[in-house]
A protein has these predicted regions:
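Nucleotide/phosphate-binding catalytic cleft detector across ATP-hydrolyzing
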Residues: 1-140
Length: 140
């Protein structure tokens, strides 16, 4: 991927325990599915392992959330923030500007239309321009 690449392709496995991001055939992110948010502002403070370490050990104004339960989104906003934070960890230093994201996301085969819409919306709000869902597939 060069200096002027316009699109970055990533595959994401949103898991209840861990979320994995793959790009160029390599796992580049493998982090716990946890996000830490400021209770007052709802801004993301940490994601993944850093957020997991904050669980029940932080200031009362910080809450840690596992946004997925049983493979589906339980907290839409927290999931979006977690996805944004994890996507930022993907190496994009070689770009003059941030590329648009083409995302493939594995979802449980029994997902309802509402759950699928929540995954798609979270991915789009997290920066995905083209979002594709693959049913009953785990990338890990």
């Amino acid at each position: 991927m060069g200096l002027f690449s316009f699109t970055q392709e990533i595959a994401m496995d949103l898991g209840t325990a861990n979320t994995i991001i793959i790009t160029n055939g390599k796992i580049v992110v493998d982090e716990p599915s946890v996000v830490a948010l400021d209770r007052r502002t709802e801004k993301m403070i940490a994601v993944g392992e850093k957020a997991k370490l904050m669980h029940e050990k932080t200031h009362e104004n910080i809450r840690t959330i596992r946004p997925l339960r049983d493979g589906v989104i339980a907290d839409f906003y927290a999931c979006e923030q977690m996805m944004r934070g994890l996507i930022k960890q993907v190496n994009t230093r070689n770009h003059l500007f941030s590329p648009s994201l083409r995302m493939v996301i594995g979802v449980p085969s029994g997902s309802t239309e509402v759950e699928l819409r929540a995954v798609r919306d979270s991915a789009e709000h997290a920066g995905g321009r083209d979002v594709y869902l693959i049913f009953g597939y785990s990338f890990s």
